[in-house]
Amino acid sequence: MSAQKPGLHPRNRHHSRYDLATLCQVNPELRQFLTLTPAGEQSVDFANPLAVKALNKALLAHFYAVANWDIPDGFLCPPVPGRADYIHHLADLLAEATGSIPANASILDIGVGANCIYPLIGVHEYGWRFTGSETSSQALSSAQAIISANPGLNRAIRLRRQKESGAIFNGIIHKNEQYDATLCNPPFHDSAAAARAGSERKRRNLGLNKDDVLNFGGQQQELWCEGGEVAFIKKMIEESKGFAKQVMWFTSLVSRGENLPPLYRALTDVGAVKVVKKEMAQGQKQSRFIAWTFMNDEQRRRFVNRQR
């Protein structure tokens, strides 16, 4: 297993502080959500879900050419810089086979969400093609609306409904399909109560009372599942063995470092040939993803070159 030291990825477009004047020009509705910090600096009211949504609209339009983006109330509104970091580190992982980032990689996003965030960034930054899976018909409808509202995305992103309860890859990866990588931001809580407690902690950290709005939205399938993150990723690992020749790299975010040991044991049990951990950091937030493959170095080189 190899690891990388944390830090915002060099190719991430969000190293600098937000240029709020420019972002307000891109999306004028953002202006109403600007606040002043105790130091007298302009900022965004991150505790307000409407403010975070307005900021995301501006960021996606300004940096990623997504002119039309929206999500229904109650769905996760993702922090764009952190999502971009996953995409850039994934690009580096794909580049290790041949020394260059593949321009026409095919990526499977497990749980694409109503926001469709990973495909939007990946298509713009690297020209990749995406398949996004979802269990929620409402989330799929939202993601499809985003795709249809922005020219060119229909050719780059396709969506599939996961109809099989508890399945992850089964029913989504079709016979004879090949993917350079899968990615996933798994539900991390193990119950609805734990998800609510997590939201309450964030509320307290922001100094909010129980009546204040909160930007940490999320539907059940986005926030929790039976057994939590470890159980979900273990299921993913178990199913991945059946697609060992169709997918070069399987990857997933892991929210807590203490969840890694049981996942490493599961990867040993299924016979993963190589396992990689990539550490990431966005401000005070530390995150990571693990990646595993059933292909050796030569097999991965051949896989990458199959359509080149």
Swiss-Prot record:
GO BP annotations listed: rRNA base methylation
This enzyme's EC code(s): 2.1.1.181
Top EC category: transferase
InterPro entries reported for this sequence: METTL16/RlmF (IPR010286), rRNA_lsu_MeTfrase_F (IPR016909), SAM-dependent_MTases_sf (IPR029063)
Protein localization: Cytoplasm
Reaction catalyzed: adenosine(1618) in 23S rRNA + S-adenosyl-L-methionine = N(6)-methyladenosine(1618) in 23S rRNA + S-adenosyl-L-homocysteine + H(+)
Keyword Plastid belongs to the record: no
GO-annotated cellular components: cytoplasm
Database matches in Gene3D superfamilies: Vaccinia Virus protein VP39
Gene Ontology molecular-function annotations: 23S rRNA (adenine(1618)-N(6))-methyltransferase activity
Keywords of the record: Cytoplasm, Methyltransferase, rRNA processing, S-adenosyl-L-methionine, Transferase
Keyword Transferase annotated: yes
Described function: Specifically methylates the adenine in position 1618 of 23S rRNA.
HAMAP family given in the database record: 23SrRNA_methyltr_F (MF_01848)
UniProt record similarity statement: Belongs to the methyltransferase superfamily. METTL16/RlmF family.
Protein name (record): Ribosomal RNA large subunit methyltransferase F
Species of origin: Escherichia coli O17:K52:H18 (strain UMN026 / ExPEC)
Name of the gene this protein is made from: rlmF
